Design a protein with these regions (language model features):
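Conserved catalytic core of the tyrosine transesterase superfamily
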Residues: 1-298
Length: 298
């Protein structure tokens, strides 16, 4: 796929030799990162890209170099998506920032509330959507983990689930009472109606009674995002970012968040502390009396 992209840059885009060589260098470096982490190119997720950017940052690369790598990845994955090599573009929300702040997008509390209030819970699909969004925000699951959930992965009585992340690593993740309530409603009503006469071990189903696809859920979430004007920054992974950010903003331990997210390397989790630090500074300058006075006098 990389070779085909390079040929496209040469034959159709007519880029200079030096520019093409930069693309080759960046993509070779990226492919080596994927290979060392046992990640298939076709299965790269938003989190993998965020992890790669964090890796570049922690390896001491300059902001200019990292921004070039991001630009390369955005163009590469846009090409793969347009060629229908991948069902979803994981680099869609990966932006080249004006200032060097490689921070994942997340929702505010108000945006989360608006999103959670959108599904029509009088319908089977609305009950499903409500349960999926509540569970995603409550657990920080990857979208692949969410759609792969089976009925026997849930312990409703104790309010936790078992998921199998990257490398088939098992982890136990608790979920909220709200998520529990909407899960029970969906399981006892909406899921039965979606299932009809079929049998399925999977928790979340489409209108044909089959396991909902990653792309299908992506489209559902984007449609909700359009209704409240946050489509540009909303994806399944945005809710994972939001889960981590909100936990840290409310004092959660970084190591605990790492375990809940299923990160093998804590440096991937540490990127969320930058967001929380920005939030702390905002609170300080807004509410500390001497900080406000100094700011007013400047």
């Amino acid at each position: 796929m990389i070779e085909r992209f390079i040929n496209y840059l040469i034959s159709e885009k007519g880029l200079s030799k030096n520019t093409v060589e930069s693309y080759v260098f960046d993509l070779t470096h990226f492919k080596n990162f994927l290979d060392s982490n046992n990640i298939e190119l076709k299965k790269v997720s938003e989190e993998d890209l965020t992890g790669y950017v964090a890796y570049l940052y922690n390896s001491g690369y300059s902001p200019r170099t990292i921004m070039r790598h991001i630009s390369t990845l955005r163009n590469f994955f846009k090409f793969l998506y347009n060629e229908e090599d991948i069902p979803v573009n994981p680099a869609e929300i990966l932006e080249t920032p004006k200032a060097f702040k490689m921070l994942p997008k997340y929702l505010t509390n108000d945006e989360v509330e608006k999103l959670l209030n959108l599904p029509d819970t009088t319908t089977p699909t609305g009950q499903r959507d409500k349960a999926m969004i509540e569970l995603l925000y409550a657990t920080g699951l990857r979208v692949s983990e969410l759609i792969d959930l089976k009925m026997n992965n849930l312990n409703l009585e104790e309010r936790f689930l078992i998921t199998f992340g990257k490398g088939s690593k098992e982890r136990l993740v608790p979920f909220s009472k709200k998520a529990y309530q909407y899960l029970v409603t969906y399981i006892n009503d909406g899921r039965i109606k979606l299932l009809k006469d079929k049998k399925s071990y999977f928790l979340f189903l489409n209108v044909r009674g089959n396991k909902i696809s990653r792309q299908g859920f992506w489209k559902i979430l984007k449609a909700y995002g359009r209704k409240i004007g946050i489509e540009h920054k909303l994806s399944p992974h945005t809710l994972r970012h939001t889960f981590a950010t909100h936990l840290l903003e409310h004092g959660a331990d970084l190591r605990a968040v790492q375990i809940m997210l299923g990160h093998s390397d804590i440096s991937t989790t540490q990127i969320y502390t930058h967001i929380s630090n920005e939030r702390l500074k905002q609170i300080y300058f807004n509410f500390h009396p001497r900080a406000k006075k100094q700011d007013d006098n400047d």
